[in-house]
Amino acid sequence: MIKILADDRIPFVSELFGDFGELILKPGAHIQNRDLLAVNALLTRSITSVDSALLEGTAVEFVGSATAGFDHIDSTWLKKQSIHWAYAPGANATAVAEYVLHCVAYLHKKNLLPRKSATAAIIGVGHVGCVVSDRLRKIGFTVFHNDPPRAQLEKDFISVPLASLANVDLVCLHTPLVKTGNFPTYHLIDNRFLKMLKPGSVLLNAGRGAVIDNNALLQCDHVITCLDVWENEPTVNLQLLEKTTIATPHIAGYSKQAKLRATLMIYDAFLKYFHLSDTRRFSELQQLQETMTLNIQDGRNAEDILLTLFDPGRESQRMRETLAENPDQFEYLRRHFPLRNEFSAIQLTPTPSALLRKELDDWGFK
């Protein structure tokens, strides 16, 4: 019998993994080495550091992380110990891209971003960056890409140098955090880059906090800042928080569908590793995810609908007020943040007019 220990915040973990052996649920922040001594499979999230301190001397042979990144996993050590591991790359790509669209809608409403002839730069064009690029193009942006590692691997990929991005209206960061090698991203956005940006440009980071030198950003007064990730989080620089136009607690990828997608990806890896057969069909799981019905009032446009679903301005104010009162509440805000529905799971009533339908299609509603 397989013994499985899982983070209790992984959606549908009991429904998917409960039939394959003994399943133990525990908060990810409290998982310790002694919990894993007789455990064969560990299912976790980014809140748990997976390294020698956690796994040395345990029976763990498979690690599945229901996350799009693996900064919290010491993959080198796991490989040396012949411990198989899997994660969920791209699971949250749609959710992050739609977070960016919510921010764009909010910035449009505040007249902080042009609606016509707007330009955007995507720095880091992987799973998430590709989707963000596609969605921005569909609402009229001219999009430039910066991803030197990808350009080195793909001869047809065009990576625009950072120095050529001075005049774009929107800069979106979607790189992993890399501190070594030929293409480090730690403090990629530094004082020099920030000074280069034109006044009134928007800098949006929904990737990794330390890709931006937050101290340099604190001294930058000519750029509109939208941050979902923060250097040194869960500790947030409160002065920087006050300067941001949009501030959220690392929740850009928080959608119901993204969470389910991530669970299914590690579920598939688990089945493959242990040579097991699927006991659930994806269609059955989809039925567990209820769609959301939104009533469209007269006169609403697509941006109004986006901001009804998720208003970055309102959430930013809530974060500022909460952390001003208690700076240690970042993880609490993140843990208890309500999951959004992706646009594909939203039903609009009554049926939109042909004009609104076209507008909604451009923004990604189907």
From Swiss-Prot:
Pathway per the UniProt entry: Cofactor biosynthesis; pyridoxine 5'-phosphate biosynthesis; pyridoxine 5'-phosphate from D-erythrose 4-phosphate: step 2/5
Similarity comment text for this entry: Belongs to the D-isomer specific 2-hydroxyacid dehydrogenase family. PdxB subfamily.
GO cellular component labels: cytosol
Annotated catalytic residues: R208, E233, H250
Coarse class of the protein's main subcellular location: cytoplasm
Known partners and oligomeric status: Homodimer.
Record localization: Cytoplasm
Protein name: Erythronate-4-phosphate dehydrogenase
Known catalytic reactions: 4-phospho-D-erythronate + NAD(+) = (R)-3-hydroxy-2-oxo-4-phosphooxybutanoate + NADH + H(+)
HAMAP family listed in its UniProt record: PdxB (MF_01825)
Record function comment: Catalyzes the oxidation of erythronate-4-phosphate to 3-hydroxy-2-oxo-4-phosphonooxybutanoate.
SUPFAM superfamilies on file: Formate/glycerate dehydrogenase catalytic domain-like, NAD(P)-binding Rossmann-fold domains
Residues that hold NAD(+) according to the record: D147, T175, D228, G253
Protein residues bound to substrate: S46, T67, Y254
Family annotation (Pfam families): 2-Hacid_dh (PF00389), 2-Hacid_dh_C (PF02826), DUF3410 (PF11890)
Gene: pdxB
GO BP annotations, alphabetical order: pyridoxine biosynthetic process
Keyword field: Cytoplasm, NAD, Oxidoreductase, Pyridoxine biosynthesis
PANTHER family the UniProt entry points to: 2-HYDROXYACID DEHYDROGENASE YGL185C-RELATED (PTHR10996:SF178), 2-HYDROXYACID DEHYDROGENASE-RELATED (PTHR10996)
Organism: Coxiella burnetii (strain RSA 331 / Henzerling II)
Keyword Oxidoreductase assigned: yes
